[in-house]
């Protein structure tokens, strides 16, 4: 069995950003038009009037102030309220592939690797652009990587599940190094007409190089000490979009074909599950929570992260102990915890212990214990 390290990370950030104020202006314009168009039905009590949103409400509910997006104009158009991403020919790289390439090239550079050093590609994300061929194989082709590639989906936990999958391949000698990528166009499955969730997501892509420790040469190395995964079925976060939708015409375009969640139930149920799993994971490795210098957590909701770390530490965490990026990136699903890792790792001294954890739909939770070399 080979010892395994993360030797490089990469980040692709879209050029466009939407502030809470911009998002609210679009949403409230839609609300005013809807209420005006349905005034008589609302007066008769047949339908409920929609309620306006506010930037203050969004920040208080989530900690989010802005988000990066692949398309801004389509989202902010009150007549559309969805990203506008023209279909590409089969001879062009797909949107997810384009994003993955941007993150992957940076990760390869930081790891000091070329395509010739990589034996496999894993694309792990919450929404795949198509059924087949695999996006990972397209990324493999775009970067000139030999070996194998495959896609996997564990929603917001896809990155930690992908890291374990990559680590297993390297540990067993099936690959020298694996490129694991998380391209997320979360705005594509978000209902921008839903007051409770229209602000939640942003777009981004991350990449991680997992390789044998004895061949790693970069200055960004972290030993993968241990990984631990957990899943438990729940309908509280769900998206029913799929290839069988066309077989049931009555459901096409329904609200459940986009992201839906029972937010309060998710908060109540997931926070203790995550804290318990991380705590048990550390204990299994004869490590104390007090030994952990940094927690890179899934970036979905600021209050969730505060509560999880408080359950673990028995006190409030500092900004250095549990870095936050969701204020400017929002929830980027599987990419979020890796963005926090990518942007907040260089200051840690050698020997520092850290935990990378993601959690979300499924329910699914992943924990990766890392030690900086």
Model-assigned labels for residue ranges:
Residues 6, 50, 54-154, 282-305:
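Conserved beta-ketoacyl condensing-enzyme motif
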Residues 6-8, 58, 121, 162, ...:
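Conserved small-residue
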Residues 174-205:
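Flexible, glycine-rich active-site loops centered on histidine and acidic residues
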């Amino acid at each position: 069995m080979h010892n395994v390290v993360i030797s490089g990370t990469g980040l692709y950030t879209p050029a466009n950003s939407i502030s809470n104020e911009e998002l609210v202006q679009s949403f409230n314009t839609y609300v005013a038009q809807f209420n005006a168009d349905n005034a008589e039905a609302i007066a008769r009590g047949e339908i409920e009037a929609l309620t306006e949103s506010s930037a203050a409400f969004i920040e208080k509910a989530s900690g989010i102030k802005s988000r990066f997006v692949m398309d801004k104009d389509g989202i902010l158009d009150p007549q559309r309220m969805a990203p506008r991403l023209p279909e590409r020919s089969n001879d062009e790289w797909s949107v997810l592939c384009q994003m993955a390439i941007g993150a992957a090239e940076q990760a390869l550079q930081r790891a000091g690797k070329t395509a010739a050093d990589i034996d496999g590609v894993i694309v792990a994300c919450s929404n795949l652009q198509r059924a087949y061929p695999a996006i990972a194989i397209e990324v493999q082709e775009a970067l000139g990587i030999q070996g194998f590639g495959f896609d996997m989906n564990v929603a917001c936990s896809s990155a930690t599940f992908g890291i374990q999958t990559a680590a297993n391949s390297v540990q067993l000698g099936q690959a020298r190094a694996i490129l694991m990528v998380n391209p997320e166009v979360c705005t594509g499955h978000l209902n921008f007409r839903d007051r409770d969730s229209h602000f939640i997501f942003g777009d981004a892509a991350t990449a991680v190089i997992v390789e044998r420790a004895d061949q790693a040469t970069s200055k960004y190395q972290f030993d993968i000490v241990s990984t631990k995964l957990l899943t438990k079925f729940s309908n509280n976060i769900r998206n029913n979009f799929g290839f069988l939708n066309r077989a049931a015409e009555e459901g096409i375009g329904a609200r459940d074909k986009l992201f839906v969640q029972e937010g309060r139930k998710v908060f109540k149920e997931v926070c203790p599950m995550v804290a318990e799993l991380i705590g048990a994971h550390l204990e299994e490795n004869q490590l104390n929570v007090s030994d952990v210098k940094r927690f890179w957590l899934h970036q979905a909701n600021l209050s969730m992260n505060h509560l999880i770390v408080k359950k673990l530490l028995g006190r409030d965490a500092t900004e250095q102990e549990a870095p936050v990026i969701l204020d400017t990136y929002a929830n980027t699903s599987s990419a979020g915890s890796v963005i926090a890792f990518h942007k907040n790792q260089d200051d840690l001294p050698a020997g520092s212990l850290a935990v990378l954890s993601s959690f979300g739909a499924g329910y699914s939770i992943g924990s990766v214990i890392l030690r900086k070399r």
